[in-house]
Amino acid sequence: MLDVNFFDELRIGLATADDIRRWSRGEVKKPETINYRTLKPEKDGLFCERIFGPTRDWECGCGKYKRVRYKGIICERCGVEVTKSKVRRERMGHIELAAPVTHIWYFKGVPSRLGYLLDLAPKDLEKIIYFAANIITSVDEEGRHNDQSTLEAEMLLEKKEVEQERDAELADRAKTLEDDLAELEAAGAKNDAKKKVQNAADREMRHIRERAEREIDRLDEIWNTFVKLAPKQMIVDENIYNELVDRYEDYFTGGMGAEAIQTLIRSFDLEAEAESLREVIRDGKGQKKLRALKRLKVVAAFLRSGNDPAGMVLDCIPVIPPELRPMVQLDGGRFATSDLNDLYRRVINRNNRLKRMLDLGAPEIIVNNEKRMLQESVDALFDNGRRGRPVTGPGNRPLKSLSDLLKGKQGRFRQNLLGKRVDYSGRSVIIVGPQLKLHQCGLPKLMALELFKPFVMKRLVEKSYAQNIKSAKRMVERQRPEVWDVLEEAIAEHPVMLNRAPTLHRLGIQAFEPILVEGKAIQLHPLACEAFNADFDGDQMAVHLPLSAEAQAEARILMLASNNILSPASGKPLAMPRLDMVTGLYYLTLLKKPEEFGGQGAYAPATEDGPAQGVYSSLAEAIMAYDRGVLGLQAPIHVRISHLRPTAEIEAELFPDGWQRGQTWLAETTLGRVLFNELLPWNYPYVEGVMAKKPQASVINDLAAKYPMITVAQTVDKLKDAGFYWATRSGVTITMHDVLVLPNKQEVLDNYEAKARVIEKKMARGKINEAERYQSLVDLWKEATDYVGQSVEDLYPDDNPIPMIVKSGAAGNMRQIWTLAGMKGMVTNSRGEYITRPIKTSFREGLSVLEYFNNSHGSRKGLADTALRTADSGYLTRRLVDVAQDVIVREDDCGTKQGAVVPVAVPVLDAEGKPTGNYTAADFVETSVLGRYLASDATASDGTVIVAEGDVVGEGELQALLEAGVEEVKVRSVMTCATNTGVCSTCYGRSMATGKKVEIGEAVGIVAAQSIGEPGTQLTMRTFHLGGVGGDITGGLPRVQELFEARVPKAKSPIASVDGKVRIEDDDNFFTLTIEPDDGSDDVVYEKLSKRQGLATLGTGGVERPIRDGDHVKMGQQLLKGAADPHEVLRVMGRRGVQQHLINEVQKVYRDQGVAIHDKHIEIIVRQMLRRVTVIDSGSTEFLPGSLVDHADAVAASKEAVKTGGRPVEVRAEIMGITKASLATESWLSAASFQETTRVLTDAAINKRSDKLIGLKENVIIGKLIPAGTGISRYRNISVEPTEEARAAAYSLPSSFGDGFYADDTYGEFTGAAVPLDDIDLM
């Protein structure tokens, strides 16, 4: 078989009939499948052993040859080759068709490739293929011209004969009439009788004339049709066609069905057609030119690829291997079969019937009908339901055709090639494992035994517990005691991978060291929950076992949980204390007064009566006092410390040369805070203060920036232990009695009720309208809610557990306390409008029926939104991954001098608005500048270089830039990166997940997609209803989708295309806005601007107001409220402008939700959206005008053309939505597995596309190592050379007496804990 590692490209093309016959092992002639009595495949049927191979290994069909020794022999009795039955998965057959049929993909696809090639409308094509019309395939122009006069004379003669016949008939009838009238006259009949006879005769004579006229017209039509007859002309009238055939068959050929199409294709001159189309494109205009362009695309594709267009019409069709369309016996003797077998049977039945009819010489009309049915059955086999009603099976279910097997989530691509079920895996419910270290997980014994079964069995045999593998297997199945000891050894230092679905970002799969636990639930470390988004309300997780040494090494070094503390999206630590741990540490670091519990033994200065109280010579002494109950945990004390580094101020004051370990200093603190600082590294400056969630987070952020990962991992583990310990001892619980209700609440509400009644009265008297009443009531009750809420907040004492949980940042917010104890306030209905009756009760008091009903609107909408959001967010992630999956770091530095200018600092102004000389950080520097390399020197105002070109901007450099007052810097950006496919390490900058320069091979595209998609679920499905402001303002997830799909926004705002002064004219419902450009060029006029949408606002001196007459606007500025159209921004501001616009707009949505994502992730996606350009003038290059090409390819082709003295290509920048950009990717495998599978494959086959296998998806599909991470070529084929020490150690056993071997301080050596990445030389 073909090995995937030995090819670098995969091409798809059109198969000709000869190809299909070459693939085939024999013709399938019968529609039978298997014999119902013997259950053996029928000969020449769809499961025939002679064609597809034996059903049993090394055994022919009749049983004459059995066993492997007859390998390769073909049995002379039954004709079956003796081989493995696996060949039934790869051997193909074919069906020889009695009449050619067209391939439905090329005829029915949009656009119709057959139609474009032959210049026929799809409707006409359908009529021809399905035998509803005839088409002329060739005309003997010369013969017709030579014989035209003779033929015309014959035709005139025939017409004359018709006229003579008509005249003779008329004369006869006239004579008969005369005789009849004479007879009547003789009989003395009345006038009425005569009139009747006269009328009857007139009528008959009129019919005679009309019949003759029709005949003459018919002859004229036949003649005119014949004279103008041209190839590809369609004749719908069958009678005329038959007449033409009878009279002039020597001068033309024609036909109907796929046969006629085949004849046309065979006589089609591709080169001549391409030349004539190019001429039309050169000289033509309008629709004609457009159609020529579209046709040229198809014609040029066939010319360029060397595909034979005749492949679009099939003379024989392939039959896929039987194991891919199996038939299985069910209980009760019935069979379940793949739909394909039914579809193949229909084709074979109709084909055999057609053969029989042709042999019998059946009438043409019957044969044509049978051919049409054959065409329809082949269509159904290839793509059921594409044309007409689908073929259905039992229960009216449409049968799954070959196309359906590839399409969609259940298709071959997404179900079996991109995602496979894997062995060595298991799943179970998760529970918390607070005793675990960060790099450990608890694995249930039974699950571990099943996962590690082969390893355990091997060891049982090695250790002579079992004689052979079979008995070892039996021991494992019976769970003998010795099995557990061996299992312990097998799992030691063998990491497992845990995964929780949905895996929204790369931290959804992490590696852990397994620890065997009783029970059947997997134990998860509490700090790993954030990354997995796991909780313990019944969540399940899957376990996977890395088998090979390489896989284990990757799991340990790259995926171990303790190496993945930072978020790849923002670079912030994810393994933070949460919930109980926060409460515990908050409680530990509180400060209490001496009279409160926990504040006893506080510091008191010396008096005349005695020495100072609460002064301790060491931490040990303070702990002793605490143990005796003399000292409270939160009491302020003075304690002498020598093992912890002092705060920065104390260090500067007492130790100007720097503090050394062992030097003592006096801390004014509490015992709890000293214990907290003991958890941090000893040389980290002492942290003083109450540690709520935010201060804890900033400490861990700081640690992550300054210390190796291993130290951070150990520290957060200690924080976790201490957090749980003190949370338990704090005794924080919530009861109904802790919820305090405002005593004077009723009075307050009565007061607001009176105000509400006043508003209602005003409305009744007509003083205010409905909208004003609504707004007044909303404002009034919001004020009431805030007042009650604030009063409730002030009512709670500090030691009440409810505000304690909120203030510590463990859970909830003050708003929820208002709801619990104050009043719920205003709620919205399903349309998002406020209900003007507020909910006045709190949950503690209980809601009335009406209030409960009003409240349920919003709750239901919330639930519906959440469900929709999850699906939408998942689909967004999928599209983002698809568009960016081939963006991989390909080289260290692309050498570009370009970059993006980003703000760093803004000057601080005094009260009068004058600069003070100080600077503060610009907004969002952490997500824009941090972690990037400079593209040019960053210099202070006096010219000194603060950070040199090519240096990275880290936290220290950022601080230096701020102090020097550097307002903006030019940084390297992926959007200006010159690497052809992918990006370079320098333009990307630091990896957010490691804090170091990104490594070559990192799949930054997928990381970017995950970073944007993962918080997608948190974004709301928000559409704001701001009464009458140009409809709705889209926000949240829909806005992000709108931006990435480059859609025109609903409330679109025009943008200024020049700098200039604004003039506003006010019409009834619209504004007319004129800009007088600064450069004196013609005025730019914007007409019919909606008043409802409202003019955009200008921010001047901290005040926002709408644009006014005479204001100055800058190019690209919005003129109305709403959102700008990205396509317009591209036109006005160019590529750089639209890039910045998209990044800012996406960030705006995420920042609203408090989600931090680094700009570089969004830049990668935007870069992919702007990759393509449209060719306007192809110059001397191969490109077709109007085609979309890669920007890099266009630049390269232009350079090449100019070098050889030609003209460069002229292009226009395009912005494509992510879906369109994914489908326009170079890789057809990736595009086909994304969406519109059949369309992509049709196009790829016609163009004979080659897939260079650059991205990740295409390599996953064919089963190759992905070209990213450790799979890139420079890391392949690395073998480990053991050192002499390692060789020696391999043959010596460690002594089991040495205590140090198992001691805890050998962290990272034998404990299976994380080893800092810096210590391992990966190269």
Swiss-Prot record:
SUPFAM superfamilies tied to this protein: beta and beta-prime subunits of DNA dependent RNA-polymerase (SSF64484)
Any GO BP annotation: DNA-templated transcription
SMART domains, A to Z: RPOLA_N (SM00663)
Recorded GO MF terms: DNA binding; DNA-directed RNA polymerase activity; magnesium ion binding; zinc ion binding
Note on cofactor: Binds 1 Mg(2+) ion per subunit.
Cofactor(s) the record lists: Mg(2+); Zn(2+)
CDD domains in the cross-refs: RNAP_beta'_C (cd02655), RNAP_beta'_N (cd01609)
Any Pfam family the entry gives: RNA_pol_Rpb1_3
Residues binding Zn(2+) 1, per UniProt: C60, C62, C75, C78
Binding site for Zn(2+) 2: C894, C977, C984, C987
Highest taxon, organism lineage: Bacteria
Entry EC number(s): 2.7.7.6
SUBUNIT field: The RNAP catalytic core consists of 2 alpha, 1 beta, 1 beta' and 1 omega subunit. When a sigma factor is associated with the core the holoenzyme is formed, which can initiate transcription.
Protein name per Swiss-Prot or TrEMBL: DNA-directed RNA polymerase subunit beta'
Organism: Corynebacterium jeikeium (strain K411)
Gene: rpoC
